[in-house]
Amino acid sequence: MKLFLEKSRFLRFLENTTKIIESNNSNYELRGAYFQVRQDKIILISSNEDISIKNEYLLDGIKNKTEGESDFLVLNSLLKNIIKKCSDSIILEKEKNTLKIFSDLQSYEINLLDHERFPDIKFGLNNSQLQLKTEQFKQALKNVVFAADLSNAQELLLNSVNLSLKNNILTLVATNRARIAMQKIKTEDSQEFNLTINSKVVKELISLSMSNTLILSPGTFELKIKSGNLEIKTKVIEIPYMNVENVFPNKFNFVIHIDKKELLSLIDKVSIVNDEKNGNKILIEYNPSKKEKKLKLSSYWPDLGFSEVFSDNFEVESEILLKFFINANYLKESINVFDGMISIFITENKDRMVISSETNLNNKQLIAALRGH
């Protein structure tokens, strides 16, 4: 079998399909890229056990063509590094258990892995299918995944994103208990499903290049996705997700309206004197009894020092005293899903903050208060 390929197009295809491969995977075969070469296309499959990808590279019979058909499994990291060194035109030639690569005055030879030991992954969509705009879905994932506890390998639900479809609304949720991020997408689909996927898988989904639309196809033990020639299969977490809708309060006694850029600037300035060990803690204060009514953010760390910043570029709906300790990183990540003016709602007992904005009415963020100094 001999393949003739355009480097730039093939490299884009290879990198997009194999970016999920883990070079240190304990299953050695999963370090490989599995090629199935046919007369009109190349089928490429990759997997890291949690997520698997199948993609097709169409052969035009001119600059991209094959002489013969074959299946082979090649160490992905080695193949990719070689392709990057090649010039514009590449020839891949399989002979028995080796793959030879030629490009102008360069030549390489790689020993192949045993493709028969590569897992038999069943792609193809399930009966349940939901069509979405790809960018809308990926943005929704971005708007919630940061709230998951990526370092928590013990409590799977806190290191995951939940997707549920009910009453024509697809709801995406992530939480680490100290905060919740929720995004909703309106659909025209009346079916129902509820599934949870690991946050690492979510980040891998976001990174993939896809066509303009995609199909979500939930199953009992997996979520399948199809976008153009790209097919994805991911594992789901088989533990019921907690209901977080009722955690969001609906009664508040303090509301701040402030521009996102203004608040981000304040957080960046005050966080210079801060530390991860201190929980990146800052204090938000408002005192209506003072002559000059300003919003104050301050940070104190015994071994580092003290900082405070003020703003008069804001509005409040309640002339009451406010003191609210919060994780600065959580606040920054939450407001970054919005643009322009944001609204911050604080409960009467000052234990929770809810953030929303007219710029993204389908998203809301909740952050629990930290204890004071």
UniProtKB/Swiss-Prot annotation:
* Molecular function (Gene Ontology), one example: DNA binding
GO cellular component terms, alphabetically, are: cytoplasm; DNA polymerase III complex
Localization of this protein: Cytoplasm
Pfam families per record:
DNA_pol3_beta, DNA_pol3_beta_2, DNA_pol3_beta_3
Q: Which family does it belong to?
A: Belongs to the beta sliding clamp family.
Q: How does it assemble?
A: Forms a ring-shaped head-to-tail homodimer around DNA which binds and tethers DNA polymerases and other proteins to the DNA. The DNA replisome complex has a single clamp-loading complex (3 tau and 1 each of delta, delta', psi and chi subunits) which binds 3 Pol III cores (1 core on the leading strand and 2 on the lagging strand) each with a beta sliding clamp dimer. Additional proteins in the replisome are other copies of gamma, psi and chi, Ssb, DNA helicase and RNA primase.
- Role description: Confers DNA tethering and processivity to DNA polymerases and other proteins. Acts as a clamp, forming a ring around DNA (a reaction catalyzed by the clamp-loading complex) which diffuses in an ATP-independent manner freely and bidirectionally along dsDNA. Initially characterized for its ability to contact the catalytic subunit of DNA polymerase III (Pol III), a complex, multichain enzyme responsible for most of the replicative synthesis in bacteria; Pol III exhibits 3'-5' exonuclease proofreading activity.
Identification of the protein by name: Beta sliding clamp
Q: Which gene encodes it?
A: dnaN
